[in-house]
From Swiss-Prot:
Keywords: Amphibian defense peptide, Antibiotic, Antimicrobial, Cytolysis, Disulfide bond, Hemolysis, Secreted
Native source organism of the sequence: Pelophylax ridibundus
Name of the protein this chain belongs to: Brevinin-1Ecb
Domain of life: Eukaryota
Tissue: Expressed by the skin glands.
A Pfam family it matches: Antimicrobial_1
Length: 24
């Protein structure tokens, strides 16, 4: 469960960060 959550976060957070800061 934990590795899956870490993998999901690794995909999710960069996209959110990209939208907020507009630095991709």
């Amino acid at each position: 469960f934990l590795p899956l959550l870490a993998g999901l976060a690794a995909n999710f957070f960069p996209k959110i960060f990209c939208k907020i800061t507009r630095k991709c």
